Amino acid sequence: MEITLFDPIDAHLHVRENALLKAVLRYSSEPFSAAVIMPNLSKPLIDTPTTLEYEEEILKNSSNFKPLMSLYFNDDLTLEELQRAHEKGVRFLKLYPKGMTTNAQNGTSDLLDEKTLEILENAQKLGFILCIHAEQAGFCLDKEFLCHSVLETFALSFPKLKIIIEHLSDWRSIALIEKHDNLYATLTLHHISMTLDDLLGGSLNPHCFCKPLIKTKKDQERLLSLALKAHPKISFGSDSAPHFVSKKHSANIPAGIFSAPILLPALCELFEKHNALENLQAFISNNAKTIYGLDNLPSKKARLSKKPFIVPTHALCLNEKIAILRGGETLSWNLQEIA
């Protein structure tokens, strides 16, 4: 059995910086045609020059791959700065509530203050897409749900602004997406295939710790159903986020799962298991093209076959290891060729 996926798109990707970027980028740039690149670096991408500099670093270390750049939402994003970014091809704003995830210490404290709403109004006028890490302070399993009132306010106040709930994790958010025409979402591999049991049901597994948290069986099943039917308002976004094992095995574990090396084989396995392989093309590419208005992307064909693939346990960067999701396991699908 074989399947060919055309122009795979990762709508939510972290490729880090410097040596780590060079070590992990190929796992995404080779099989994927394009990816929405997250801006929460150690020095966040808060303006056009730093964003374009990072884009150039990605382009230098890849080929036949389109990084879709995003700006880190901040109070200094004037109308002029947004216009400058838009003229250079930047189409995404990423809003991080302060302190909610990795490198979000510079995030937005009050999501509904006057300055935030002013920036969103300008973003709507210029045709930006707003990507939001939709969590608010509260009990860890309810943080996304607690952000619903903010999402509703945004959706109603800015009806022409496309708003993406990144890495949807709570089944209660599905109704919001279906209620508001301008609300969309991305889904990760880990949120549609894993639950809290994978993180802490046995021994604590730091390599399954991410934000938003993987949640209950009900959440996983409801989100998986969206993916399997390729719901038209949902696109695939891996949120692949590499960290060194030395940091993952520490007293202060950073959030993030490195899934890039297994994405296409694991998705094929999952969709085949549920008799939904015919919908994988839409989930992995077509929906994103429609939602984000993407065209003129690098052409790419990923051919996979139903042959065993033993997942490597680690990727290497200098003298450090990066644990790969499902490392050491055998998947039933294998990436055979990229053209």
Curated annotation (Swiss-Prot):
Cofactor, free-text remark: Binds 2 Zn(2+) ions per subunit.
Binding of substrate, residues: 14-16, 40, 133, 243, 255
Cofactor requirements of the protein: Zn(2+)
Pathway: Pyrimidine metabolism; UMP biosynthesis via de novo pathway; (S)-dihydroorotate from bicarbonate: step 3/3
GO biological process: 'de novo' pyrimidine nucleobase biosynthetic process; 'de novo' UMP biosynthetic process
Catalysed reactions, semicolon-separated: (S)-dihydroorotate + H2O = N-carbamoyl-L-aspartate + H(+)
GO molecular function terms noted in the UniProt entry: dihydroorotase activity; zinc ion binding
Active site (UniProt): 239
Modified residue annotations for N6-carboxylysine: 94
Assigned keywords, A-Z: Hydrolase, Metal-binding, Pyrimidine biosynthesis, Zinc
Binding residues annotated for Zn(2+) 2, in chain numbering: 94, 133, 167
Top-level taxon of origin: Bacteria
EC number: 3.5.2.3
Binding residue positions for Zn(2+) 1: 12, 14, 94, 239
GO cellular component entries: cytosol
Alphabetical list of SUPFAM superfamilies matching this protein: Metallo-dependent hydrolases
Catalytic EC class: hydrolase
PANTHER family: DIHYDROOROTASE
Family recorded in the similarity comment: Belongs to the metallo-dependent hydrolases superfamily. DHOase family. Class II DHOase subfamily.
Quaternary state and interactors: Homodimer.
Cited NCBIfam families: pyrC_dimer (TIGR00856)
Job of this protein: Catalyzes the reversible cyclization of carbamoyl aspartate to dihydroorotate.
The protein, known as: Dihydroorotase
